[in-house]
C-alpha cells in the first residue's frame, strides 16, 4: 500500500484495519479481543522491520499494559464503570491492553495524543477492537476537554516533541529544531 499511496507503513496499518472492520466483518467477529490486539501488535512490530520510525511511534509493551490493568483492577475493584484517561496515548495499544485485563468493566477510554498520525491509528484500532475510545488529537499539557477521570494512565514518549512553537516557550525547549519530548 505505501508504494501505491505514498503513506507510511503505520498510516497504512490504520487503513488496513479500517478495511477489515468495514469490509470483512465476518473475519473480525471470529476473533477475540485478545486475538485482534495481538494481530495489531504483530503487524505493528513487523512494520518496524520495514520502516525506520521515530522513537515516540513505538507501541507500549504488553507487560506495562497488563501491570497497569492489574493495578487499576485492584484499586478500583468496587467500580463497575470507569473513565480512564491515557495521556500521550500513541497508537492506543496501552489502553487496549488495559481494557483486555478489565474486560468485565464498562470503560470509557479518553486518549490524548498530539501526533496526528498516531491519533488516526488509535481511532482505527478502537474500531478494529470494537472498544470505545474518545481520541483527542491535542497536546496533553494543554487544558483537556474532560470533566472526570477515575484513572490516568500513560507511557510517556521518548523522542521529539512535535510542536516546535510550543516547545520554544518551555525551559528545556530548543531554540531551533525539535525539542525532546522526554525532558
For every predicted segment, state its role.
Residues 64-65, 69-154, 159:
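Conserved S-adenosyl-L-methionine
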Residues 21, 44, 75, 136, ...:
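Sequence-level detector for tyrosine residue identity
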Residues 1, 8, 138-141, 183:
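Secondary-structure junction/capping motif
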Residues 1-101:
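Class I S-adenosyl-L-methionine
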Residues 155-183:
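Mobile active-site "lid"/loop adjacent to the S-adenosyl-L-methionine
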Residues 8, 32, 60, 104, ...:
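Serine/threonine-rich low-complexity intrinsically disordered regions
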Residues 56, 75, 100, 125, ...:
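Generic preference for flexible, low-structure residues
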